[in-house]
Amino acid sequence: MSELDQLRQEAEQLKNQIRDARKACADATLAQITANIDPVGRIQMRTRRTLRGHLAKIYAMHWGTDSRLLVSASQDGKLIIWDSYTTNKVHAIPLRSSWVMTCAYAPSGNYVACGGLDNICPIYNLKTREGNVRVSRELAGHTGYLSCCRFLDDNQIITSSGDTTCALWDIETGQQTTTFTGHTGDVMSLSLAPDSRCFVSGACDASAKLWDVREGMCRQTFTGHESDINAICFFPNGNAFATGSDDATCRLFDLRADQELMVYSHDNIICGITSVAFSKSGRLLLAGYDDFNCNVWDTLKADRAGVLAGHDNRVSCLGVTDDGMAVATGSWDSFLKIWN
């Protein structure tokens, strides 16, 4: 037997040991434990604002920490900063590449970033002395498209890429300080833990991984999806996360139990999920779908509690405000809608 075969065998044995250990931990299901909890009831949200101004498909949006301003990125080659209270555009930033896939608002509110098919992550300073928005740094280093980016602070940002890696950047120097390798497919999405010490990533290898930001190590790998994971989002307490996939399911994974807790699916739902987000308490899971709808799931019961219907094309992105008071959805119909 060749050395490679021996190693393969060893890896299989280790995988089986992990599977058995996980089974031993799974002494109850989430459905059993939440059986006595009242259902959340029918969730009916209304469109409170429609943000009009983009001229093409919207691909991404991200709320600022003030729960008022948000940034959106569109195929029209613009980043727009919106005031969600008044629907006014605070800034419209022309991009060098219109093939944008992600955008992010820094926690401080001083910067926004975006990225896409040009493999570069430009950082824009919103608070210049002159009052104009300008590129403060362009982060180049990925060898594939940028699928997602999230600021840790004004000088650090994490990116995920189609080159199968994630990276932590020092914005001032423009250098990758850590590269997170381990996925075997395009990384599509990332979500920072509430304490910012770790993050999760979802990829086209149908797995999700938990990473330690400072050590650059993969801590855990979660499998279960049958197709690409397009979206990922941490549970508000940081102990679990949800994923959305092309296999038409959302799933809830628990870090401490090291396994899947729940599947959110319905026989009538046969299209992929583009985006996921939790309500402030975590009781509701919102998911955007290719069929133009956004479904609201009861996280504990896996029942569908409501639908946000109003877009005329695929819901490509969604986000819940930090204060938990509103949801924004962005769509290929070129509009953003604010619901509550």
Swiss-Prot record:
Pfam families: WD40_Gbeta. It comes from the Eukaryota. One of its GO terms (biological process) is G protein-coupled receptor signaling pathway. PROSITE patterns: WD_REPEATS_1, WD_REPEATS_2, WD_REPEATS_REGION. Guanine nucleotide-binding proteins (G proteins) are involved as a modulator or transducer in various transmembrane signaling systems. The beta and gamma chains are required for the GTPase activity, for replacement of GDP by GTP, and for G protein-effector interaction. G proteins are composed of 3 units, alpha, beta and gamma. This is Guanine nucleotide-binding protein G(I)/G(S)/G(T) subunit beta-1. The lineage of its organism: Eukaryota, Metazoa, Chordata, Craniata, Vertebrata.
